[in-house]
């Protein structure tokens, strides 16, 4: 992927924003289990960082996705996983379908304030019994006059405790699972919505997560994105941006793991020599850096195809699979070289070790990615190429 001066200017803007507005507070926010999301999003919105590839008509920059990929990569310089995940929910999970298929009225009501950072969004897909199995979700939105009446619940919803709206995937008919779902924009202040207490997660500690319940929640049918029954297809498209964001976002974070480990191993001496002089260690770090470059190349190739309008299902799935597995590999190896210090809760590599584990679970588990790749290779049993 060829970067222009405009790409590099955006890269500098994101990095300065992270350096001055986020990283000085990460330790505090990680301990608190939350960060001031409205404040940070408003500041990001003022810089245009929440609408890079969104339509100019609604306040976005109108740039192609290569710029969004650059921003996602630079958000990886945040010294925790929870905050970039919350940003990714706003930019690449709860708004792509709205931006692409939503009515002008819906985009004015929800997309514009999401781009400016005045409103925080969340995405409502996963349920207790339907995580990667999106077709199996049970939440319903039944017609009643000009409204939908929504009942059910959504689980592990990032940003939900502070969200102003949710982009909700629900069953709007009794038809077949892949054609009975719709995406509906629902204000979180709508009567009948309630939340669980904050979920206590292994990692991504600074992002807020809860279960969301819907008890006869009534919203106008005009809040539906696009045609009724097209929600599953839209969500599959939305997943592509989520997976590209997640993979791009991993690159700089993994490099930070390696860089901080190198610095520690230069200072730490055992048996009279610096740890970094141990061939096992410096060879392993070289291997891991090489793998990160492979991930970067895969992300860039997928992004190039995406901005050309090509189907990136295969490459986005591969990039997400590679990112999740490499994240575990890098953080585990680096933690080992920190020894007992790596086992301490506040150690940066220990935090990465906890945070990156979600990448192989959320947004489609590794096993789902493998199934997609196998299907496209023509080797998934019972499936034709």
Question: Language-model features: where?
Answer:
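Short, surface-exposed charged micro-motifs
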Residues: 138-140
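Short Gly/Pro-enriched turn/cap motifs at secondary-structure boundaries
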Residues: 87-88, 114, 129-132, 156-159, ...
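Flexible, small-/acidic-enriched active-site or ligand-binding loops
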Residues: 136, 189-220
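Short Ser/Thr-interspersed hydrophobic loop/turn segments at strand-loop and sheet-helix junctions
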Residues: 48, 71-76, 170, 186-191, ...
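Helix-loop "lid/cap" segments that line or gate small-molecule binding pockets
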Residues: 92-101
């Amino acid at each position: 992927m060829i970067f222009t001066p405009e790409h590099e200017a955006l890269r500098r803007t994101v990095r300065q924003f992270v350096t001055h507005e986020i990283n000085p507070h990460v330790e505090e926010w990680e301990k608190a289990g939350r960060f001031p999301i409205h404040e940070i999003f408003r500041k990001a919105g003022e810089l245009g960082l929440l609408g890079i590839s969104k339509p100019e008509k609604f306040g976005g920059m109108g740039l192609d996705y290569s710029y969004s990929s650059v921003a996602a990569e630079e958000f990886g310089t945040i010294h925790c996983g929870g905050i970039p995940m919350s940003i990714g929910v706003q930019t690449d999970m709860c708004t792509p379908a709205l931006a692409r298929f939503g009515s002008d009225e819906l985009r004015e009501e929800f997309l514009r304030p999401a781009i400016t950072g005045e409103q925080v969004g969340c995405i409502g897909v996963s349920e207790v019994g339907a995580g990667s199995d999106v077709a199996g979700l049970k939440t319903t939105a039944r017609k009643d006059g000009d409204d939908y009446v929504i009942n059910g619940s959504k689980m592990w919803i990032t940003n939900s405790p502070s969200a102003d709206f949710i982009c909700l995937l629900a069953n709007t008919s009794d038809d077949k699972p892949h054609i009975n779902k719709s995406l509906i924009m629902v204000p979180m202040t709508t009567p009948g919505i309630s939340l669980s207490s904050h979920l206590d997660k292994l990692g991504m500690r600074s992002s807020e997560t809860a279960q969301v319940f819907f008890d006869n929640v009534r919203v106008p049918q005009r809040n539906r994105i696009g045609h009724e029954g097209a929600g599953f297809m839209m969500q599959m498209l939305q997943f592509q941006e989520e997976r590209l964001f997640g993979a791009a976002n991993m690159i700089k974070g993994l490099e930070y793991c390696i860089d901080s480990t190198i610095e520690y191993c230069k200072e730490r001496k055992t048996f009279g020599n610096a740890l970094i002089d141990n061939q096992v260690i410096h060879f392993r770090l070289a291997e891991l850096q090489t793998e990160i470059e492979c991930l970067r190349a895969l992300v860039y190739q997928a992004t190039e195809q995406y901005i050309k309008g090509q189907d990136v299902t295969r490459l986005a799935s591969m990039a997400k699979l590679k990112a999740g597995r490499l994240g575990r590999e890098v953080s585990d190896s680096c933690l080992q070289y920190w020894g007992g210090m790596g086992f301490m809760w506040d150690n940066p590599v220990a935090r990465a070790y906890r945070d990156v584990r979600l990448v192989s679970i959320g947004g489609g588990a590794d096993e789902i990615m493998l199934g997609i790749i196998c299907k496209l290779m023509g080797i998934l049993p019972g499936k034709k190429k």
